[in-house]
């Protein structure tokens, strides 16, 4: 019977619960000291090499694994490394001795740089991206955690999956309660890193047939491009290794804008464009909408994503695909009938001969497990299922669906009826009653407010009735404005009548005064002092004194 060696207070991966690590001739195992967490076992023949490194939680034993021949070749589905933290410095000799005794392999000690420099050398190994400072390791990132890589001139960005997506097998339970508790206990995590890679790299293609032009043009590439291509190759995030279920070519994606080839795999899809690539797990798809466009020529498939995909600092929580309504295609899935029946319950077909949008929607629906929401009974004044309106400076279409409002443009806005506190109907800036448009302000229970602007006045009754049927609280400020305008108009009419009567009376007095002035020209001095508001105002202004000075001069001439 082989002996067993044990270490206490050892952490596995990113787990916050310590456990016990046991090592024997047949392999090693780890289980948490408290709770009902997963037990990790690694057979001896799967361990390729061992590394000792200083980390935040004392020292780490990194175990590099042999690649499982039966597993898919994607790095994300076949982790190549597992870590155990919590060893103390004095454990090195004991651990090294037992690894050599049980597995006949050395324990390599890796030096760590503590200079704190943010410049150095980026190196890609079979398992990690390593950042070296003076040939010492500053940090390393497992390739199995890398979800995507993009390049912009001399800058290479790397995007990372969250822990649930990195190691789905490490979850301890499947219930919502356990999942919620697990998510709450997690702290900050790395989601993106950018490296500035200047300079040129010479591409060694080993071809003797290359021409002089090829040597000048094709053999040279930037160091950033070489690093980017190496990342894609090692992490399997470019042309994904393995067999895809189906590929859709040159699909127009409105958000983020561009044409992409969509590779469909069993657990994720990959969007491959000219500049950007995206890997999207089906587990991150939480909403599907199939919507007709107002032009009646195209159909949109809107996919809600959580977490959203990223393009630099821009986050895209929705993916908007557009298809011509009449476009059809023949597609054959790379699946056998047994897999379709057993794994997908017969919900997929081996061969499709249908409109493209129906094929894509059906495949995404089955693989993601999400229902597809479509417009139901709402009809606008023009017979459409949507209403044209604006959000801020962007124009788009508002779709009143059965359970939510969905505004589709560059950045869609989704508002479930259950989260609406109040819907407010108002005119633009309190415009007059003849205004042809109005605004819909939606205040949510969380305090967020969405304003859909410049909606045609003809849609008011239909939209109000639709929201009322969904038990949405409605405040119609337009009715209040109309009542206020009516009262103001009535008051205005009354004041206009009074002014006309007073004006008529004032006109008669002026005529009489003018007649008196003509008959009694000699008494003009007394007329000049007659009490009138106009004359008194002019006297206060000083104009009347000038006129009074001229009249006595005329009398002296007579």
UniProtKB/Swiss-Prot annotation:
Top-level taxon of origin: Eukaryota
Disordered: annotated segments: 162-186, 495-558
Keyword Oxidoreductase belongs to the record: no
Family listed: Belongs to the SSRP1 family.
Pfam families linked to this entry: PH1_SSRP1-like (PF21103), POB3_N (PF17292), Rttp106-like_middle (PF08512), SSrecog (PF03531)
GO BP term, pick one: positive regulation of RNA polymerase II transcription preinitiation complex assembly
Broad class of where this protein is predominantly found: nucleus
Further comment found in the protein's record: In contrast to the orthologous protein in animals and plants, this protein does not contain a HMG box DNA-binding domain. This function may instead be provided by the HMG box of the associated NHP6 protein in the FACT complex of fungi.
Annotated InterPro entries: PH-like_dom_sf (IPR011993), RTT106/SPT16-like_middle_dom (IPR013719), RTT106/SSRP1_HistChap/FACT (IPR050454), SSRP1-like_PH1 (IPR048993), SSRP1/POB3 (IPR000969), SSRP1/POB3_N (IPR035417), SSRP1_DD (IPR024954), SSRP1_sf (IPR038167)
Keywords: Chromosome, DNA damage, DNA repair, DNA replication, Nucleus, Transcription, Transcription regulation
Quaternary context: Forms a stable heterodimer with SPT16. The SPT16-POB3 dimer weakly associates with multiple molecules of NHP6 to form the FACT complex.
Biased composition (Polar residues): 163-180
Biased composition (Acidic residues): 495-526, 535-549
Keyword Transcription belongs to the record: yes
GO molecular function, one term: histone binding
Lineage start: Eukaryota, Fungi, Dikarya, Basidiomycota, Ustilaginomycotina
GO CC annotation terms, alphabetical: chromosome, telomeric region; FACT complex
Protein's name in the database: FACT complex subunit POB3
Subcellular location(s) of the protein: Nucleus; Chromosome
CDD domains: PH1_SSRP1-like (cd13230), PH2_SSRP1-like (cd13231)
Function: Component of the FACT complex, a general chromatin factor that acts to reorganize nucleosomes. The FACT complex is involved in multiple processes that require DNA as a template such as mRNA elongation, DNA replication and DNA repair. During transcription elongation the FACT complex acts as a histone chaperone that both destabilizes and restores nucleosomal structure.
Disulfide bonds: none
């Amino acid at each position: 019977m082989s002996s067993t060696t044990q270490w206490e207070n050892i952490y596995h991966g990113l787990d916050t619960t310590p456990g016990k690590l046991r090592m024997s001739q047949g392999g090693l195992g780890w289980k948490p000291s408290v709770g009902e967490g997963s037990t990790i076992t690694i057979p001896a023949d799967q361990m390729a090499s061992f590394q000792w490194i200083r980390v935040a939680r004392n020292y780490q034993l990194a175990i590099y694994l042999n690649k499982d021949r039966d597993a898919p070749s994607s790095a994300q589905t076949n982790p190549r490394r597992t870590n155990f933290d919590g060893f103390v410095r004095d454990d090195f000799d004991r651990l090294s001795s037992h690894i050599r005794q049980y597995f006949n392999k050395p324990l390599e000690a890796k030096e760590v740089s503590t200079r704190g420099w943010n410049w150095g050398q980026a190196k890609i190994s079979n398992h990690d991206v390593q950042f070296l400072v003076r040939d010492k390791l500053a940090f390393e990132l497992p390739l199995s955690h890398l979800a995507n890589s993009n390049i912009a001139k001399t800058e290479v960005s790397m995007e990372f999956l969250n822990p649930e997506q990195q190691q789905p097998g490490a979850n301890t339970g499947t219930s919502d309660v356990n999942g919620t508790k697990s998510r709450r206990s997690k702290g900050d995590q790395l989601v993106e890193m950018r490296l500035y890679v200047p300079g040129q790299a010479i591409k060694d293609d080993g071809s003797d047939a290359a021409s002089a032009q090829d040597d000048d043009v094709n053999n040279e590439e930037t160091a950033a491009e070489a690093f980017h291509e190496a990342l894609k190759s090692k992490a399997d995030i470019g042309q994904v290794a393995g067999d895809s279920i189906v590929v859709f070519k040159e699909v127009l994606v409105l958000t983020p804008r561009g044409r992409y080839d969509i590779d469909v795999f069993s657990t994720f899809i990959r969007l491959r464009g000219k500049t950007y690539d995206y890997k999207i797990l089906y587990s991150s798809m939480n909403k599907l909408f199939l919507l007709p466009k107002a032009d009646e020529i195209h159909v949109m498939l809107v996919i809600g994503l959580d977490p959203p995909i990223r393009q630099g600092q821009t986050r895209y929580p929705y993916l908007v695909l557009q298809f011509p309504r009449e476009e059809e295609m023949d597609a054959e899935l790379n699946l056998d009938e047994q897999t379709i029946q057993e794994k997908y319950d017969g919900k997929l077909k081996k061969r499709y001969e249908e409109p493209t949008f129906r094929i894509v929607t059906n495949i995404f629906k089955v693989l993601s497990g999400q229902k597809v929401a479509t417009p139901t009974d709402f009809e606008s004044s023009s017979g459409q299922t949507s209403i044209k309106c604006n959000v801020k400076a962007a124009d788009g279409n508002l779709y009143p669906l059965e359970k939510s409002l969905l505004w589709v443009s560059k950045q869609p806005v989704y508002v479930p009826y259950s989260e609406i506190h109040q819907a407010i109907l108002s005119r633009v800036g309190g415009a007059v009653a003849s205004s042809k448009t109005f605004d819909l302000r939606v205040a949510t229970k969380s305090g967020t407010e969405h304003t859909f602007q410049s909606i045609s006045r003809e849609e008011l009754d239909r939209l109000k009735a639709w929201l009322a049927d969904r038990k949405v609280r409605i405040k119609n400020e337009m009715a209040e404005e109309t009542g206020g305008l009516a009262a103001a108009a009535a008051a205005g009419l009354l004041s206009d009548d009074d002014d006309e009567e007073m004006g008529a009376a004032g006109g008669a007095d002026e005529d009489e005064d003018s007649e008196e002035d003509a008959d009694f020209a000699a008494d003009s001095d007394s007329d000049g002092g007659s009490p009138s508001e106009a004359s008194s105002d002019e006297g206060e202004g000083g104009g009347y004194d000038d006129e009074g000075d001229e009249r006595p001069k005329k009398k002296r001439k007579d």
